[in-house]
Amino acid sequence: MPWLSGGRRRRRGQPREAPREPPPSAQPQREPPPAPPAAVPTPPAPSAPPPRARESAELPLPAGWEEARDYDGRVFYIDHNTRQTSWIDPRDRITKPLTFADCVGDELPLGWETVYDKQIGVYYMDHINKLTQIEDPREQWRREQERMLKEYLIVAQEALNAKKEIYQIKQQRFELAQEEYQQLHKMCEDDSRSYASSFSGYSTNTKYDPHQIKAEIASRRDRLSRLKRELTQMKQELQYKEKGVETLQEIDRKMSSTHTSYKLDEAQAIMSELRTIKKAICTGEKERRDLMHSLAKLTDSFKNSCSVTDSLVDFPHHVGVPGDAGVPQQFCDAGSQTDIIGEFVFDDKTRLVDRVRLNWQYEEARKRVANIQQQLARLDNESWPSTAEADRDRLQLIKEKEALLQELQLIIAQRRSAGDVARLEEERERLEEELRRARATSAQGATERILLQEKRNCLLMQLEEATRLTSYLQSQLKSLCASTLTVSSGSSRGSLASSRGSLASSRGSLSSVSFTDIYGLPQYEKPDAEGSQLLRFDLIPFDSLGRDAPFSEPPGPSGFHKQRRSLDTPQSLASLSSRSSLSSLSPPSSPLDTPFLPASRDSPLAQLADSCEGPGLGALDRLRAHASAMGDEDLPGMAALQPHGVPGDGEGPHERGPPPASAPVGGTVTLREDSAKRLERRARRISACLSDYSLASDSGVFEPLTKRNEDAEEPAYGDTASNGDPQIHVGLLRDSGSECLLVHVLQLKNPAGLAVKEDCKVHIRVYLPPLDSGTPNTYCSKALEFQVPLVFNEVFRIPVHSSALTLKSLQLYVCSVTPQLQEELLGIAQINLADYDSLSEMQLRWHSVQVFTSSEPSRTREAGCAGESSARDPAHTISISGKTDAVTVLLARTTAQLQAVERELAEERAKLEYTEEEVLEMERKEEQAEAISERSWQADSVDSGCSNCTQTSPPYPEPCCMGIDSILGHPFAAQAGPYSPEKFQPSPLKVDKETNTEDLFLEEAASLVKERPSRRARGSPFVRSGTIVRSQTFSPGARSQYVCRLYRSDSDSSTLPRKSPFVRNTLERRTLRYKQSCRSSLAELMARTSLDLELDLQASRTRQRQLNEELCALRELRQRLEDAQLRGQTDLPPWVLRDERLRGLLREAERQTRQTKLDYRHEQAAEKMLKKASKEIYQLRGQSHKEPIQVQTFREKIAFFTRPRINIPPLPADDV
């Protein structure tokens, strides 16, 4: 604080000049508080002030402040700077907690005061809000919790009663259906006996048609089985709700009635039990996975196991790394500094597009997650949890009563006895009366709450998908950046080992129990399994293909991709690590100057997300801004695709030809045709020099980069394809009985005409416009390896009404799937159903497939024309060259910033592979080493010969001739071009194994564009009289100079050895190395009461009990399948095939079996990111100021007990 270093001493006693008016906050507090209740307890003696009050008195007052007393002897403070008075000591902001959540023991937060009155006793003053109250504010939250618990118990009991009534009505429906089934069965038996005892013939003695009776019996049997499954499921849900309500009632009796407050030892015992339960749950989850694997193996042993598996399980579920396959691993001995040959990287120009595109997609995914979080926070503030479920139960009760009433009316119409008819009539009249009352009392708010709950479920589903996509992009970005790993100096060999502890400590304690660990993630209603074949990316309407509307690869859920990004500056990081500051083009910034971020910084994923967030994206936004400033209006936000034969506006047939075979290589250089994506509409004049240099930290070793020639483009199957157009063989048949359209996809002919990449599979997606939103309208075939021809031979049953059949058109999408599970649209075939006269019989026809390729040939031609015009017009050439230089410099800057983070990303990736034992061991070693490093760090910094050096950038502009739309574009199949490594590759400069202090210098060095402001502020540099250059050992040709201080290693060279700022309730740091400030978890920010501890304990016990029940159900299911297998059954039992939930369970077991360790780690990373996003939603609720975050979280806690989480369905009985 500014007044800690000096200021006016406070003066005790009367001030020199009394304040002209009493303190503004004195008048409200000096008024007598409201009269206490009739029975006022004996006033307790005023408690001694906490020790922190004495600490506040020991500090000097800030400059311009004075302490004084009023006529009653009360102390107040005068601020001569603003000429105001206050009851609050300004030093309390340093020594006292700010909120009740930060209080320890009997502390009161800033602005609160305990006052004793002779008549009333002890009361409390809130000087900030100018209020007084009799109740202790430290106990007020506990009473509020008890009140909310009692209110929720009333709502939960009403919902439980409605659930019980639903179960009873469904039980009545089941009994009626069972009675009808028995009567039909008895009727069939009587008729068969009458037929057997008669000798006059079948037609004269049978009262009913036996085939009709058997069909009716089969229909009633299916209905009876369905009702029995619903009863079993409802009984399970009812048991969960009953146990939850009983648990809450027991907590209410224990905590509210007797006012139980836990002591320290009791609270410690509860936390110990929570950690024990957490370990037991982890063990149970492992056993659950083992049981699922055994179930999958058992299912595969049956013949009809294919009936329960999904057609999409053939897709590889693992997330691979593009470009990693076939990369040879190179190793070297880094024991000597002169043994290092530079950087083992591919050509950065080939990696730049992928990295920038991934950065952009990652940024868009994070923005989508943030948008969904905002919407969820607003929705959760508007509704109570579990209120919509209770409203839905009431509506379901009305529907069940209506169904029972209809069944009673049908039964009464049949011939029954007089007693049965009278009993059923009385039941019918009672139901009609109850329905009239229910409809009269149904409120409009119930419907609105149900709609809000449906919207919340949809948003939670989108949040899960968006976090999964973000985690996938993050892993891809990390792998891509780590694949271009740079080698640091040999003198910094121990930097990785010394930094391991920071990662391990940031991962959090293994024994910590968070809110999501106890109560789990937010739950939502899963969609039906019937929609499992829905398309995983947004389909393009076929009618929009004829227009010149650009569309892009949709990598995620709907609304994820945008046609054009805004020009706002993303919040990216400028300098990512002190260790990488020497290899970056921007001056290092101090992490202590970073603003307080809203997200938690504890997890490695969060740190990695921030490290991957910024470099490419910042340059991309700058590039767009500069392009806009230069007047370039031809920069589309995303690459457009057009099918063959569908030209856009203003394009003729001559523009759809192949690209020119050669391009002039002179002042304008055309890159290789990854550059079909890279050509701008105007030619870019660049320098043809290729030069990248590595900086070996503080060793002074400077060697040019040795390029590698393994960076070859992917061959495309289309290069050797025949000239025949692709065609698909499809058969159509209308099933009038079930009102379905049978689509028989036979084979795909001439698939070589499609641009299928290597190692990609091909599948067909069938799309028919749906009748309503709840009907599945998209179906997917199995993915097949590329071959000629592709034989699918699959039949899809699509529900469609016969009257609407001729008005629809069937669309077949030919897609390819990469090993990284990326889908790419290859072609579309449209089938107009009106062209088929009659579909009563299967009709087979060949349909042509319109192939989708890049629209870059037109841009290539335009670029060539622009190059010719620029050759004729020198002025035009100069203007284009000016624009190109700015863009080229920015792209070169992007490359350098991306390289700066590569080492740290690779280290992070390696650290994540450590086991828990290794992490604990590294934590212990770091604790021992930090005490030594603290004492020796200052001496090392003096002995190392600190000097100032000039950070420079690569001397030559990197040749980047590409369009912005290509950077963000669709990943097309790569094609060979004239600018390939084999044709144009400079020979590497050979040097000896000594310290290289010589290199070529540019006579003129272009200045870099000034770095844009970022989220991290610049640290103040060391300023010395002269700049020392260490014999030109660093990259020459400085473009943007700054001063950097070097120690023995560059790990701490970018920060000052100053103390960290004071942070309350945190451990004293025992190292001077700066680390990212981390926010405490959600549980630590909240004031935890005894009621919270009891709820956490009971919730953990509930989760453990539910997990044990699931394990028992899985063991029983495995035992039943094993018994069926021992009896010699070759097919799955019928009770498995009839239950859709059991089939879904077996599909999930099959998916987990096909999962690899890498897939499992990616799934865990996605789940961890979803937990983090859920915590941030709670923080956003508190920021809205509608309700405190404690209130929202407590409501979620109590709603956990009455919200059933059924993951394993109950096993059905084989009989009815």
Curated annotation (Swiss-Prot):
Superkingdom of origin: Eukaryota
Domain C2: 722-847
Annotated Low complexity bias: 570-598
InterPro entries per record: C2_dom (IPR000008), C2_domain_sf (IPR035892), C2_WWC (IPR037771), WW_dom (IPR001202), WW_dom_sf (IPR036020), WWC/KIBRA_Hippo_Reg (IPR051105)
A GO CC annotation given for this chain: cytosol
Compartments it resides in: Cytoplasm, Cytosol
GO BP annotation list: cell migration; hippo signaling; negative regulation of cell population proliferation; negative regulation of hippo signaling; negative regulation of organ growth; negative regulation of transcription by RNA polymerase II; regulation of DNA-templated transcription; regulation of hippo signaling
Transmembrane region(s): none
Keywords: Coiled coil, Cytoplasm, Repressor, Transcription, Transcription regulation
SUPFAM superfamilies: C2 domain (Calcium/lipid-binding domain, CaLB), WW domain
Cross-referenced SMART domains: WW
Single Gene Ontology MF annotation: molecular adaptor activity
Residue span, WW domain: 59-92, 106-139
Gene3D superfamilies: 2.20.70.10, C2 domain
Region (Disordered): 1-63, 487-508, 546-612, 634-668
Family indicated by similarity: Belongs to the WWC family.
Protein name: Protein WWC3
